[in-house]
Amino acid sequence: MKNFPLLASTALAGVLALGLAACDGVQWGEGDQPESETSQAVEIASETESVGPELGTFGIETADMKPSVDPGDDFYAYVNGTWLDTFEIPAERSSYNSFTRLFERSEERVRKIIEDAAAADAPMGSTEQKIGDYFAAFMDTDAIEEAGLAPIQDELDRYMAAETHDDIVALMLDPSVAARSIVGIGVSIDAKQPDKYSVYIGQSGLGLPDRDYYLSERFADKAVAYQDFLGDLLRFAGVEQATEKAAEVYAFEKALAEAHWSRAERRDRDKTYNRYTLAELEEMAPGLPWASSMETLGADGEEYYIVSTPSAVEETAKIFRDTPVETLKNYLIAGAIRSYSSVLPKEIDDRVFAFTGTELRGVPEQRPRWKRGVSAVNGAMGEAVGKVYVERYFPEDSKRQMDELVKNLREGFAERLENLEWMGDETRKEALAKLDAFTPKIGYPEEWTDYSALEVSADNPVENMRQARIFGFNENWSQLGQPIDKKEWFMTPQTVNAYYSSTRNEIVFPAAILQAPFFDPEADLAVNYGAIGAVIGHEIGHGFDDQGRKSDGTGALRDWWTEEDAARFQEKADALGAQYATYEPVEGFFINPELTMGENIGDLGGLSMAYHAYKRATAGQDVPVIDGFTGDQRFFMAWAQVWKGLYREEALKQQVATDSHSNGKFRVNGVVRNMDPWYEAFDVSEDDELYLPEDERVSIW
């Protein structure tokens, strides 16, 4: 029962979208930008020498557009169609989008940071030594081949030596081994008392991406392939009768899956907050040794524990006790081989990729070793790398400009709240107080993680992984009983993403996302508002989506809505959900409106806020037409450009089934068709496919 960091936060892009990267945009001289637009852009952009926007002549890569498509029929294809028709997803990727492009830039930069650290001949124990040696050990494939399974043999022997169910639990609690957990336990901010940390407990333990992969006929072929995969993992470890043992492990996991809550159910913050005393835990789920487990974790003195999925935990405990120890040992062995595969011999590494990459996501080729090494270092020492990343690659002026943009968006949203017709004064007062209490974090943390306790060597990548796991475990559990670390970040500066934390009531924008197509100081003002402005609005909007609205300005899970206003909100949310339920990204896979509701509300609210802020910023000004596009057109085009992307079919199926975000096409078309200004900007009429009658258009925030 390893720790799992429970983040009460909502990210801009899902994990699947985080293959992100840099764009090779066209640059142009400052004399090419229209004078009136230049004067506007300077208000939010750097006053350093202009070199022109990275993309196109004003921030949009117009060569990617497909003018033959009517914007009212498919706005996403109108803005991105030529790119969608001609771009080929790299063989090493399951998808490719704006995030991927920036991720690749970040990846190259981090590689340079790592190489410089390795070449520095730094003293033992220094950050540079640890960064360089972690990467060097990962890259030494000759040594990895020669070592075989020897580096993990002691761990495998420990699994094989287990004799009782309690022995299995002890292994699951031990961060020095890669034992998979059937129940996740970790420390996070208490959702109802956000001034303290509490222990959270929830369902865990599946080897496939989601419970549906075990239970739905749509994924029956994946279930068969997974059993074959489990058999190979056990064979690598020398387990006899591996095929039969794999079937037993699969049956155990399927039983867990049947007990698990769906992803949509786990979004409900009221239903996932359930306090239990230690005695109540033992009564509810007696199949697990709660008292000794909490003592091992140093959490036995807690007044209560928060269980996110009570029925799943209760059933998991029964399944665990009813499962033979031999099956549980094999479950742990298969999980360990999979966990360490990147630093085990090529035969094992290739087999794991064949299943997790090719079978599950349709990816033809494994990523180059150096890229995987960069990811490994980022995972182990992300903030150490991030500190250097910020020093080298993040202009301080970008932070100032973002501060100004956030200020503009907040002020604009406050105006919208003041004039929101469907909300009563009592709820409005609370909403404005919450907005006023928002904390923005931009670029990088004020304080950096101290990695002095992390031990790293240049010749043992397996041990490096162990030490990184132990370090993360200790970092998490050391927070229990301590004051809230308000300066903590949950993403590194080199991460291309953003998030909102409900328990902290904060919006966070790492440095790496503050690049084109999201943000470009040299781009047209409308483009920046339609891109990063909408991203800012999206994150603010999460504080007021179907789940974020349940927290107040302090971050506490508290119902501050009148019944009437809550009902009006739900009516609007349901109407939006009904629209998204009709969208079918891939045949047979429709968007789940319950799973994606928060993100869909964030997208619609974010773009609406950004448009309002853009009109405030340009009020009374003569906004020019650029390359034939009005300011409003450029604003909406920027939103569409941000979300352009392609998926392999298997990856798209997984995205639709497991991701709380709608895919790019519907993040664009599903939003703009609800906004009156888009209809006016592109002269959309009843004859167009995206047209919605005015009374069917949803406006929440």
Regions found by a protein language model. Name each.
Residues V51-G56, V69-A143:
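Active-site-surrounding "flap" and adjacent substrate/cofactor-binding loops of secreted or lumenal enzymes
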Residues S46-A63:
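Short, Gly/Pro- and small/polar-rich lid/capping loops
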Residues M1-A11:
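Bacterial N-terminal signal peptides that target proteins for export
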Residues G19-A22:
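C-terminal motif of bacterial Sec signal peptides marking the signal peptidase cleavage site
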Residues D24-Q27:
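Bacterial signal peptide processing site
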Residues G31-V51:
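Post-signal peptide N-terminal segment of mature Sec-exported envelope proteins
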